[in-house]
Curated annotation (Swiss-Prot):
Keywords: Cytoplasm, Hydrolase, Metal-binding, Nucleotide-binding. GO terms for molecular function: 3'-nucleotidase activity; 5'-nucleotidase activity; exopolyphosphatase activity; metal ion binding; nucleotide binding. This is 5'-nucleotidase SurE. Its cofactor is a divalent metal cation. Pfam families: SurE. One of its GO terms (cellular component) is cytoplasm. It is found in: Cytoplasm. Binds 1 divalent metal cation per subunit. Its EC number is 3.1.3.5. It comes from Shewanella baltica (strain OS195).
Amino acid sequence: MIRILVSNDDGVNAPGIKALTEALAEIATVLTVGPDRNCSGASNSLTLTNPLRINRLDNGYISVHGTPTDCVHLAIRELYDGEPDMVVSGINAGANMGDDTLYSGTVAAAMEGRFLGFPAVAISLNGRKFEHYQSAAVYARRIVQGLLAQPLAKDQILNVNVPDLPLDQIKGIKVTRLGARHKAEGIVRTQDPAGREIFWLGPPGQEQDATDGTDFHAVANGYVSITPLTVDLTAYGQLTALQNWVDKI
């Protein structure tokens, strides 16, 4: 039986991870390990200065007092009896498109699976009301089944964004590149009840590159976007120019 590790960044009790677990349980044995609280925006952070504590829940899930990356690392290195065949992260409440991927704990959980040598997928639901987790779950299962039947290179992560629509209104799947956002909006300055100054990060910037071919464009037009991501951040096109610059300094 195929074995799949499921994690997320919204927390182990979030509706998205439940929908994903149930959908994948129809085709695989699933171990669900997620953070014990919402860790949105945690990116690839690891907990290095405190121990990781776990709680085995009545539904079989395992909660971890740690980050999404902690969850996947701990699950594969210690909690799994053997190894998973794949790591799937989500279903995130909110899109992870364009620059979002740099901050996303959902993408980071999948990335940790890839670091440890396993095929990995991140699934996110784009919208405001988050009414159609089941639509995302159906597409997640379809994509996972495709990967099991025809594996892709292990050095990539599939970043999947699903529009928050009824299943019959989703037009299909498009392979996309990452779009881009404008810089985030300003910091919100306020006070706590004791009158002390506090700050909130402003909302993300609006789309800057949402042209045809981007994840933003596909999802806005009713398609599921799939973007292959790599963890190699090297700007290969700049190596020669940089060497020429270094030679002159």
